[in-house]
Amino acid sequence: MKDNSSAFNSSIYDSKVNAVLPYYTEYNKQILDLAEVFGIKNSKWLDTGCGTGNLALRVAEKFADVKLVLCDPSAEMLEASKSKLAECYNVKFRNISSQELDYKNEFDIVTAVQAHHYLSIDERRKAEKNCYDALKDGGIFITFENIAMSTEQSEMLAIARWKNYMLAHGRTEEQTENHMKRRGTELFPITIEEHIKILKEIGFTSVDLLWGSYLQAGFFAIK
């Protein structure tokens, strides 16, 4: 039985994720670069759906004065994060989902990486409204998600590219098919346009695309 919503148990997640998510390590690079330009000296940073703590570790290493709060609905993922950040100070952990966040005007930055595409539209709205509420005025929300293409034709092309990528990175034909079957059953990706629309409706004053490739995209939104 899996111990989280992703395709891999927490114990093997780090060793497998790059085989199914093209440019996975680029997500963190883009987030750190934007955060640095945004200015985060002595900031509070909430990472919801923190997983095994890959982003948080990079944040702690690059921005030593940042106070981190890491949340994840999977206790096993959170334990992996605790182990990875055992030597880092200024880090707190909570075993809750984005839908359960209860912060108000507390953080300068909120991130959610590969966390909300497991949710229905209503659940996604609640999760991202909670992220909005957690931010101080002028704070920034950065999220990376699996996405859907805007047309059936472009979706087919993107899926074909993704399949080729997985096969080239050691996944078997059966494993690749199983990953693709998760779309629409375990994963519920939405288009770039839908992402931007929801974030604006929640109340963010500035919403834009940060990065995109294959079937993944990053967005940033300012409160």
Whereabouts are the PLM-identified features?
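Conserved class I S-adenosyl-L-methionine
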Residues: M1-I40
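Class I SAM-dependent methyltransferase SAM/SAH-binding core
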Residues: L46-T48, T52-E100
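A conserved beta-strand element that flanks and buttresses the S-adenosyl-L-methionine
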Residues: T111
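Short catalytic micro-motifs in class I SAM-dependent methyltransferases
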Residues: Q114-H117
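A short glycine-rich, Lys/Arg-flanked "PGG" loop and its adjoining helix->strand segment in the class I
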Residues: R125-D137
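Conserved beta-strand signature within the Rossmann-like core of class I S-adenosyl-L-methionine
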Residues: G138-N146
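C-terminal alpha-helical "lid/dimerization" subdomain adjacent to the S-adenosyl-L-methionine
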Residues: N146-E201
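Core SAM-dependent methyltransferase catalytic element
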Residues: T205-K223
